[in-house]
């Protein structure tokens, strides 16, 4: 698999340490780091009404689609190695990625 880039929606096993038994969960690639590492952000279909949750639906995808309306959770960041990624399901629009990235930045700057 080609290394995903920022803005891609990927599927990973969760918990991340056991791909064979983990549930498959979507995540948004926030940054493609040097080497094999990626910074990802959790995506959930559970409703979240906190200051950071960013709504996501199929109209926010420039490529691919999501199964149901969801929320991107910028306060739920984690790093994984590329080999953990099962596959890519799409890519968010530049506008949606910018919206999420601005929320991520406020975690560190505000």
Each predicted region: which residue ranges?
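Conserved functional hotspots at enzyme active or ligand-binding sites that engage polyanionic ligands
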Residues: 1-110
């Amino acid at each position: 698999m080609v290394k995903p880039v920022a803005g891609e929606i990927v599927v990973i096993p969760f918990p991340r340490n056991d791909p064979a038994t983990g549930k498959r969960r979507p995540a948004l690639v926030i940054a493609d780091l040097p080497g094999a590492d990626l910074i990802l952000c959790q995506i959930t279909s559970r409703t979240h009404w906190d200051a950071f949750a960013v709504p996501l639906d199929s109209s926010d995808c420039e490529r691919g689609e999501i199964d149901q309306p969801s929320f991107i959770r910028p306060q739920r960041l984690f790093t994984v190695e590329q080999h953990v990624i099962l596959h890519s399901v799409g890519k968010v629009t530049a506008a949606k990625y910018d919206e999420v990235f601005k929320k991520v930045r406020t975690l560190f700057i505000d």
